[in-house]
């Protein structure tokens, strides 16, 4: 099911920056935000509690990757924060993914990271020694996530159609690396515009710097939201 709001990546490290950014939006504007490693490691669980207290949805993107027992226990702790979505690395294997699902329970959305959108095929082959194509690797990880009863996968928009063809109905695709037309792609290798992601079937999109570093973040958010809605 398509999420109507683009998820805003809160690429900050301090509470003050985060609060100042969120304060730009009207109180009635309920956002869906992503808390990544930088902000969570700097501010801890309290930043999640604060954002939830404002009525926003939280995607906690920590990409857990450890032995199954450790991941199960960590997810059980994160569940207590009332998060709406979490991530694990698909490379941890099906047993680890199943453990993550057990720890988090059935309420929050749980998605698997396949290949990072900063990873090129040459990098994958050289650094990870995976000698298939990048798409084949993404599909392999996505099928493992579905087998473990996860809700979806993180992938580039170019991979969405292929993933949906090999996974059960309802398996969702979250697409980072979204950039409005004409913007700087930064360190992302595989990017699309909100309109392209919508047309190709992405269920969630994540947008960071084009909103958080815009001269008018609220206007930038509303423009991207409108493009995503079609």
Curated annotation (Swiss-Prot):
The gene is pyrF. Its EC number is 4.1.1.23. GO terms for molecular function: orotidine-5'-phosphate decarboxylase activity. Substrate binds at residues 11, 34, 61-70, 117, 179, 188, 208-209. The lineage of its organism: Bacteria, Bacillati, Bacillota, Bacilli, Lactobacillales. This is Orotidine 5'-phosphate decarboxylase. PROSITE patterns: OMPDECASE (PS00156). One of its GO terms (cellular component) is cytosol. CDD domains: OMP_decarboxylase_like (cd04725). Keywords: Decarboxylase, Lyase, Pyrimidine biosynthesis. GO terms for biological process: 'de novo' pyrimidine nucleobase biosynthetic process; 'de novo' UMP biosynthetic process.
């Amino acid at each position: 099911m398509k999420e109507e709001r683009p998820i805003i990546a809160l690429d900050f490290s301090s509470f003050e920056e985060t609060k100042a950014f969120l304060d730009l939006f009207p109180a009635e504007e309920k956002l869906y935000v992503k808390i990544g490693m930088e902000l969570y490691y700097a501010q801890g669980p309290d930043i999640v509690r604060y954002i939830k207290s404002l009525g926003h949805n939280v995607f906690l993107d920590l990409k857990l990757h450890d032995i199954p027992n450790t991941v199960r226990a960590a997810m059980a702790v994160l569940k207590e924060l009332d998060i709406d979505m979490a991530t694990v690395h698909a490379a941890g294997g099906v047993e680890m993914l199943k453990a993550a699902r057990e720890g988090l329970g059935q309420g929050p959305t749980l998605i698997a990271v396949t290949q990072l959108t900063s990873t090129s095929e040459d990098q994958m082959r050289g650094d990870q020694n995976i000698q298939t194509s990048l798409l084949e690797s993404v599909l392999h990880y996505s099928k493992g996530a579905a087998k473990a009863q996860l809700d979806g996968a993180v992938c580039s928009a170019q991979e969405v159609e292929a993933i949906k063809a090999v996974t059960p109905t309802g398996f969702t695709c979250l697409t980072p690396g979204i950039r409005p037309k004409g913007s700087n792609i930064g360190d992302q290798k595989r990017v699309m515009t909100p309109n392209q992601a919508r047309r190709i079937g992405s269920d969630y999109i994540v947008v960071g710097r084009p909103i958080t570093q815009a001269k008018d973040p609220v206007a930038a958010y509303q423009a991207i939201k409108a493009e995503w809605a079609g």
